[in-house]
Curated annotation (Swiss-Prot):
This is 1-(5-phosphoribosyl)-5-[(5-phosphoribosylamino)methylideneamino] imidazole-4-carboxamide isomerase. PANTHER family: 1-(5-PHOSPHORIBOSYL)-5-[(5-PHOSPHORIBOSYLAMINO)METHYLIDENEAMINO] IMIDAZOLE-4-CARBOXAMIDE ISOMERASE. Belongs to the HisA/HisF family. It is found in: Cytoplasm. One of its GO terms (biological process) is L-histidine biosynthetic process. NCBIfam families: 1-(5-phosphoribosyl)-5-[(5-phosphoribosylamino)methylideneamino]imidazole-4-carboxamide isomerase. Pathway: Amino-acid biosynthesis; L-histidine biosynthesis; L-histidine from 5-phospho-alpha-D-ribose 1-diphosphate: step 4/9.
């Protein structure tokens, strides 16, 4: 399982939100590229970038920062989400050196777009499913739909999606542990690999994910915990690598 540091971008800075609320943000760095360097030097094997402004505006806003990080680390897998709602945007990021694009809101509102994106950019598409009480949320988590996460995930199995990033909104940024039972249930219900996100606080939460014995869980995204020092990236990755269960 990969430990994937998150770099959330708002107005060019690296921030963290609580439960997806833009008004409840903490700025951790004015230099996201240097922050990326910190996690790379700490041994991370993938980075998770989010254009928060883009998620709300429906188009990339912090694209220059994303491109700068991708150019600095051409051999590091980078995934980007937030405001990706057109093939042109995906093409821009792929050409910039980004490994994966995360389709969120558009995947819920126009599921057929995911199939189209997978055909145009095979192996590059991840679907981001953000949920509240098992129902998918959209538009920067501002809207909660009537669509159930597992039902939607199954729909994407035939499209060639590389992974699903599952985030429990109630847990995100709260550092109270991630929703392990639902994450494991999602991984068991679909053939698509699952990346857990939201609420990871310490090594105990990483162990809980591993203890779930769900082979479909391939990664865990962590944000506030690594910025506030309750989780060490290198230690957590080493723990995953040596885990025997």
């Amino acid at each position: 399982m990969l430990i994937i540091p998150a770099i959330d971008l708002k107005d060019g800075a690296c921030v963290r939100l609580r439960q997806g609320r833009m008004e409840d943000s903490t700025v951790f760095s004015d230099d996201p590229v240097s922050m990326a360097a910190k996690w790379v030097e700490g041994g991370c094997r993938r980075l998770h970038l989010v254009d928060l402004n883009g998620a709300f505006e429906g188009q990339p806003v912090n694209g220059e920062v994303v491109t700068a990080i991708a150019k600095r680390y051409p051999n590091l897998p980078i995934q980007i989400g937030g405001g990706i709602r057109s093939l042109e945007t995906i093409e821009h990021y792929v050409k910039a050196g980004v490994s994966y694009v995360i389709i969120g809101t558009k995947a819920v509102k126009e599921p057929e777009f995911v199939a189209e994106a997978c055909r145009a950019f095979p192996g590059k598409v991840i679907v981001g499913l953000d949920a509240k009480d098992g129902f998918v949320a959209t538009d920067g988590w501002a809207e909660v739909s009537s669509v159930q996460v597992i039902d939607l995930a199954k729909r994407f199995e035939a499209d060639g999606v590389s992974a699903i990033v599952y985030t429990d909104i109630a847990k995100d940024g709260m550092m109270q542990g991630c929703n392990v039972p639902f994450t494991a249930a999602l991984a068991a219900a679909t053939r698509i690999p699952v990346i857990a996100s939201g609420g990871i606080h310490n090594l105990g939460d990483i162990k809980a994910l591993l203890d779930a014995k769900a082979p479909g869980i391939i990664g865990a995204i962590t944000g506030r915990a690594i910025y506030e020092g309750t989780l060490d990236v290198a230690e957590a990755q080493a723990f995953c690598d040596s885990y025997q269960g």
